[in-house]
Amino acid sequence: MLSIRNFTYLLFLTLGLTVCGTPLAAQLGSSSGAVTGAVLDPSGAVVANATVEIHNPVSGFIRSTPTDSSGKFSFNNVPFNPYHLSVTAAGFASYAQDVDVRSSVPLSVEISLQVAGSTTTVTVESGTDLLETETSAHTDVDRALFDKLPLESQSSSVSSLVTLASPGVVADSNGLFHGLGDHAENSFSVDGQPITDQQSKVFSNQIPVDSIQSLEVVSGAPPAEFGDKTSLVIKVTTRSGLGQKQPTGSLTTSYGSFGTVTSDANLALGSDHWGNFISASGMNTGRFLDPPEFQVMHSKGNEENLFDRMDFQPSVADSVHLNLGYTRSWFQTPNSFDAQFANQDQRAQIQTYNVAPTWSHLFSPTTLLTVGAFLRHDNFGYFPSANPFADLPETLSQSRQLTNAGLRTDLSYVKGMHNLKAGVTFEHTLLTENFSFGVTDPGLNAVCLNGNGTPDTNPTPTDPAQCTGTLQPNPGFVPALLAIDRTRGGTNFPFHGHGDIRQLAMYVQDAITKGNWTFNLGVRGDLYRGLSRDAQIQPRLGLAYKVNPSNTVLRLSYARVMETPFNENLVFASQTTNDPVISGLFGANSNAAIRPGARNEFHAGFQQAFAKFLVVDADYMWKYTHNGYDFSTLLNTPIFFPIAWHNSKIDGASVRVSMPEHHGLTAFVLMGHVNARFFPPQVGGLGTDLGAGGLPFRIDHDQKFQQTTHLQYQPWKSGPWIGFNWRYDSGLVAGAVPFASDTTTPVDLTGLTADQQMQAGLFCGNVFPTLSSPLTTCAPSQYGSTRISLPAPGAESDDHNPPRIAPRHLFDLSVGDDNLFRGDKYKWSLRATAINLSNKVALYNFLSTFSGTHFVTPRTLTAELGFHF
């Protein structure tokens, strides 16, 4: 059998010979195509200076260009989608047709105009450009549409954009989102570069939203070219300067609540043969991360971004494209009242750089070869307080690095009914994990208990035999943790780990169009060699049928997916119990290294267009996974690590209703519902007590219903505009809150601190906790919460009726004018944005196993001034 090493050498050799044997190349991305052609008059003569426009009314993409002296036109960097193409020229009748961009192979059209007044007309089928005869559900969003969306966070704008624009996506804290019932099983494909690691701002730095031209969010069965993490595949097409003969750009600055200041600069310039787009931005804010209190304490942060895309096209057949990126973020860990009183001062810094060159060669009008390489590096540092005893209940320092390097190549062939693509991707990921932590709370692992059952914080006893008088031995005492108990003379526990992960993927897929039918046939093979080993063959199948009389598309799809383990702290999660401290923390029977999961997923859906005014896209999915992934934490520290459950069953519906621009009004409505059930036992990662009873449970990213409504109105093209969002979330699972087991037994609340009780909004009758007076017990009939939906006494079920975060309605508003002084070449813009307009006090989560407690953003006001040229 061919090893990964030998295959890689062979692959590099083959690609090298290919490069040497063909002309040098330049710009056709794996996530975009090109539309080229010529405009002729009835005699066959060229028509110069005709205006050619392509437009997708659903995504908002629109672009126009004049024909040159030879009547030719070209649109580069066009996202995969159907488009309405129109041509106008003086003295000629208007022309229109629909074109479908589905491959990186350029689409060539030849247009013959009729003389004005001719009886010959061109007709276009009503509603055609609203529909896509595609087998997988997806959402397309162009910059023209999302530029006016009120986005919540400058430091995680991409997450906010995906959450607000895609159905089936559940919002979580700190830029995290859950796609279709899974925990962060999302991947990005940036101009064809795969990024499958978490992009939450506590793990990594996201690409800047200024760099994005368009998004396609695939929520249906993934095509064969995508693997690893596929609940959502977010295909990003970045902005380009190719063909931009007149330099364009912008300078913007903003100021808002919490002292937030941002500055952004963008520039695009180029010619027919080269182009450059560069973006630089910076932000400083008093609320970088979502805090555990509605009141913001110790949450300052800043971020700097630099993105550069360079394109070079020396010939019609060749193109080269290079993406460069660097982002640095520094931020404080927000404090709770408990941490603030202790003067806790924990901070973190993340540095990310990315280099991704791509070369494309067009062998013929039907065949395109693309070769790409990529190198992405994350360097994460976590820093404790200067006084370690200010960090409660543990003190922690961490240095974590992730380097992902790889090579990808694909061959696209488009002819007749076939749209064929085959490719190979090799990735090598290096993990380095260094951290140390020590216990700083004398009550966390107390040797003795007082007579009333509370922990004895006296540091002197180090053996249960020393518990004398009114003291009694603590049955929960773990002797192995004495070595890291700083309050009893211990020292920090050090961990140093390294991981080496190699992955090889090969795929072939063919989208076959025959009449009103589309068939998607594909197969993917993955070879995973990391801390565990696996190999899987994964068929991908889909079909779609367009019902012309009713403007309806019906679709079915199936995918087998090999899910690879999360890389964040994977080395630590794969430790055995040879170390007494790890054994003391997680038990003597911790699990083996996490293996890749195996998933079968099924989708059924439809699209329905109503003339040119409305399109409804609905999808229902069923996902069955062996080795279902989630995350756990090291005590109460920000060291998160992956775990695996025996299996999971997830099903749910996603709906998007889109209204393209009509008399200045644009709107869309997103709706989603999911059931996310996980089944013990735990089969991978360090131990946890969740699901210890052997019964299924709802994971904490299960949510019954969420919806987003966006309205955008601009009465005339150059006038002011308004954008409005309404977001409703029914609430994530909140399993850590106490509940009434029956109608008579008082609820024991001593497991929560007074601060935690206040965060949860708990009350007992008319009594609410204060920082100095926590609740201890409460009769079931008097017990309740203002921020968490508690099951009725005796009705709690981890599977069917768990506690949940209370439902919330959030409203956002933006108003602006993109051309204040009605300039032509130079324009000034002004906009004002309000996030959480009603200042709703609500939780994202409460004592989540993965992320802890976080509140949604309070009312945030921002004003932005921009200069555009």
Regions found by a protein language model. Give the residues of each.
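Periplasm-facing N-terminal accessory domains of Gram-negative outer-membrane beta-barrel systems
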Residues: L2-S3, F7-L10, L15-T139, E152, ...
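Periplasmic N-terminal accessory/gating domains of Gram-negative outer-membrane beta-barrel systems
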Residues: F92-Q114, S118-P223, D228, V233, ...
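Transmembrane beta-barrel wall of Gram-negative outer-membrane proteins
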Residues: Y255-N284, F294-F331, R347-L369, P539, ...
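Surface-exposed extracellular loop regions of Gram-negative outer-membrane beta-barrel proteins
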Residues: W330-F337, N379, L531, Y545, ...
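Membrane-embedded beta-barrel scaffold of Gram-negative outer-membrane proteins
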Residues: T370-F374, F380-Y382, K546, N591-A644, ...
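Gram-negative outer-membrane beta-barrel transporters
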Residues: T513-T518, Y620-Y624, P642-P738
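C-terminal beta-signal and adjacent terminal beta-strands/loops
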Residues: R727-A792, I805-L810, D817-F869
